[in-house]
Amino acid sequence: MNDIALASQKGRRTLYTYFKSKDDIYFAVVETELDQIKNRLDDVMQKDLRPDDKLVDFIYTHLDTIKDIVNRNGNLKADFFSNISVVEKVRRKLDLRERVMLKIILEKGIEEGLFSIEDPYFAALMINNAVKGMEVPYIRGELEYQMKNKRKQITNFLFFGLKQK
């Protein structure tokens, strides 16, 4: 609390008038950081791209942004790796928003004849969960090289899967 008061140039008592506990402050910081992801993904949604290109851009933007946020904020980085359930609790609103964005991309792809999906919301849920599953290895640098250098293979896998043509 002392560090937060010092950094914000406020007294500890002043902080407690706005926040009940350190956890409340932590959640406020995480929510502010997650707004950056939302803003960058909003930018992707505004781009004039084909739905398949927009989907790939969306995934890469999500991963790059979360990596930047976690690496920039030491406390968040420690909690992200040690207590993901706390981070999950705070990011529920973002997850729901991302799923809506993904659904919009998928529906546009269906409309344009690019995608054949029976349930766009369920597909959005699956994509959202798959991307979240890649976050930790991506942040640690275990996937970043492959994802940067194998974008075409990743795109082919995303759109064509495992089956032979």
Question: In which residue ranges do the predicted regions lie?
Answer:
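Helix-turn-helix
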Residues: 1-24, 28
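Amphipathic, non-transmembrane alpha-helical scaffold segments
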Residues: 26, 30, 34, 59, ...
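Secondary-structure edge/capping motif, primarily at the C-terminal ends of alpha-helices
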Residues: 44, 73-80, 138-142
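C-terminal peripheral helix-coil segments that are non-catalytic and often amphipathic
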Residues: 100-112, 129-130, 136, 140-165
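Hydrophobic alpha-helical connector segments
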Residues: 28, 32, 39-68, 123-127
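Amphipathic alpha-helical interface segments
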Residues: 14, 61, 65, 130-137
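Short secondary-structure transition hinges
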Residues: 63-103, 111-112
